[in-house]
Amino acid sequence: MQARYPVSSQSPLGVVPYIPGDQGFYRTATGGGYTGMPAPMSMYSHATHEQYPGGMARAYGPYAPAQQPKDMVKPPYSYIALITMAIQNSSDKKITLNGIYQFIMERFPFYRDNKQGWQNSIRHNLSLNECFVKVPRDDKKPGKGSYWTLDPDSYNMFENGSFLRRRRRFKKKDVLREKEDRDRQGKDNPGQACEQDAQQPVKLRDIKTENGACTPPHDSTPPLSTVPKTESPDRSGGSACSGSPQSQTPQQAFSMDTIMTGLRGSPQHAAELPASRAALPGSVSLTYSPTPQPAHYSPPCGQPATYHCNMQATSLYTGDRGHGDDTLPEYTNTTNASSISHPHQSSSQESQHLQQNRLAPWYLNQSGELGHLSASYPGQQQNFHAVREMFETQRIALNSSPVTGSNSCQMAFPSSQPLYRASGAFVYDCSKF
């Protein structure tokens, strides 16, 4: 019985033997089996033959190789663009008509056929467009035909140098008109430039004056927005920042002069305080100027009215960030509330002071945060412990004494305790936290 399929040769690689290219793309079986069964294609070669035989160049055997389809597509360039390419590609930036034909046919195979049609279009575009200038041939060079070149003003007729996009049809009269307009504007510009130069110093001076950094006579006081919650202990500076009269300063802020005079007992330290504070611009201020609020504002009934604030932590942090170490002992004092404990002061101002002191709890006595300052400021630490013991005794005395007053929002100020206020059994002691 004869085999239906051809048996391949016993080669070490087990591939189909080489089939010559003249047998076509397909070949039928050699036996008497199914004659229509396709056999392996000729693209498979024998191991001993070269990897890519010459017969593979022809895809369909006896047929001639077809031209690539992309060469038969018309280029997306206009005839003006093609002529411009040919002129710019030449060495002298000028070319004959025959040179234009040769350039187009070499670069674009599409124009190798139907030469009569597109060559006629090339001649029409050379004659009708003003961007192409005809240059007579020099007698020294042999040949016939004139040269064609580009008008010097037409080099920018294509957008960004792309031959696919042309701005507009080049016309010589439009170019002349544009030149006249530019010349006219150039004559008018010097007068405008002089006027602008004459007005420019005035504008710059006005801008500098508005910014507040122009002339030396102006006050260089920083604006209120830069220091919203701190102010200098000087009464005149505090009144200027808060916008209140100088007579109201002792009622709206702590009076550091009276505190330092009362505790130190020497007016010299009180006189040196404003000067020493001026040397530390970035320090935390010990005086608070509350923002003015309506007179009918009152704290809630359950709000504690008695508090003990020790601002020594503030002074220590101030000394850590300050510039002078000799002025630090001036700040190691407890805050005296005598100015706000006056019996005739309104409850709204007292509540404002209470809220201002509540806003900065992290400055107050915290042993964990002040531990790293003990080595640098031993004198301040000793004074701090002494003041704390004094506050402890006052707190114990307040807790043991009977409470005077009612449950209303009115605050009572006992005459025996001029430095502290108490309206209930609850005592808010900042020094123990």
From Swiss-Prot:
Superkingdom classification of source: Eukaryota
Single Gene Ontology MF annotation: DNA-binding transcription factor activity, RNA polymerase II-specific
Segments of skewed composition (Polar residues): 239-250
Gene3D superfamilies, alphabetized: Winged helix-like DNA-binding domain superfamily/Winged helix DNA-binding domain
InterPro entries with a match to the protein in the record: Fork_head_dom (IPR001766), FOX_domain-containing (IPR050211), FOXC1/C2-like_FH (IPR047391), TF_fork_head_CS_1 (IPR018122), TF_fork_head_CS_2 (IPR030456), WH-like_DNA-bd_sf (IPR036388), WH_DNA-bd_sf (IPR036390)
A GO BP annotation: embryonic retina morphogenesis in camera-type eye
Alphabetically ordered keywords of this record: DNA-binding, Nucleus, Transcription, Transcription regulation
Protein name, as recorded: Forkhead box C1-B
